[in-house]
Amino acid sequence: MYTQHLSTLQFLTFVAFGVVVLAALWRLLPGKEPPVRTEPYPAEQLAAHDRRLPKYFLAGGGFLVLGSLHMVVKNLPWVADWLARAGYPGHLVRDLSNTHVMIIGGGTLIVSGLTWYALPRMVGRPLASEGLAHGAFWFTAAGLLLFYVALVANGIAMGRLVAHGWEYEAAKEHMGKLYRVPVGMGAGVMGIGYWCFAANVMLTAFQGRLVRCPKPTGHLWKFLGAGAAGLTVGTVQGVIQVQPAHADWLFRAGHAGEWIDPISHAHVNLVTGLTMLTAGVLFYLLPLLGAVPPSRRLANACFAALLGGSLAFYAAALYLGFHEGRLVVEGGLTPEQAEEATPLHAVLIMTGGTAMLLGFWLFLATVVRAVRPARGPARAFVLAGCGALAVGTLQGPVQAFPAVNELLERGGEAGEVIVNLHAQLNMLGGLMVILVGLALLLLAELGVREWPRHARFVLKPASGGVAVYYAAGIALSAVAASRVAGRETYGQAVAALEPWQALVLVPAALGVLAGFSAFAAA
């Protein structure tokens, strides 16, 4: 790559990443023999960052409320009809922006707070850098807010052009820097926040090796390390693929390019990243639930199965995206022809998907076995989240079957909505519900406030709303997909389902909004 081919945004992104790497190396490679500590750190030093943890949960709750409100608005009849007719820009507004604000804003910020509580106690030393912890919070929150606003605003602007007959590529070119600059800046700033988080996790764990004292939960840090590494890889990939040339290549690759974005990008962020972090803090906090944590051997088995399965699927998706995308972009094949020309397509997807499913189910079985006898107040949150994850992870291999995958492809955008609902159930109904319960539990443990009496108004509306939204969304999207396969446009198919679609999805989204609003208020 030549420097004259770098945009200013790319250059600044690489500089910021280099600064974080150099700072980490500076801490990892001291000029003299590092001192070994044989006495445990005092509890007050390990808890130095605890008083700042509520801001992570408050900000996460705020983003969850914003995302839930977005869910309500996008399912109003006239809004849903317009978004369906807006083509790919409608997807930016309907799905991409909504997913990012809830999963990154809600999930990542909440799990960051839980990580800063658990990690020092796992490795036996305080956080390596308070500055990196603050930077991770503010860069992630600010970058996400900019990214969200940029996607919504540009999606609406480009959607109006597409609705008047423009092609998406022409509409995107027409927006020019109004699209590229804020989206790229938002992604870059978010990436810096994630890199600060990952650097602090790695530095703290690395320096923890110098503390030579008993660490009963020391084996759990690798969940947090792997999760931080997964988020780093995912954000680097995200920054790269929003660059104009790469985004254009992915768009021209069509369905083949979707194996790279959103599939591989989402999986490395959400499974290798967020799920591993959630597993680590959940195993650590099990005693607060009144549960017995799994043995070191079983925890290590869960780690190996989750990490191996997620990386197997990530590698398979990346390979198929680049290989089949090249056949489409350079070879002139259609995505369907490129898939047929790849004999290993089904084998790779089924192998990676099955490995990931087995890893998830081993983790879920371990958690349910530990939590079921417990009587702690967060028990219901964990069990509800595990139930949603069991259903959501089962859908993944099912939709990878060639016959099912072909039906989804024939359904066009309606088929893509079904795939998105699978991820939404896993994240909102699964991991997010678990994280919300753990955050409320930790606030009570820290003495910030007692376990809220209205906690049931968090769990029941949120879990119930996500469940209804998922089931109804699958059924309605299946009907829309059959209409699209019958030569209707997606906009016509959605219009034919109104107002019945809104009568089901809007109340379900309101339930999600009520549940997460109760959490934010707590």
Where are these predicted regions, by residue range?
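Hydrophobic alpha-helical transmembrane segments of multi-pass integral membrane proteins
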Residues: 1-522
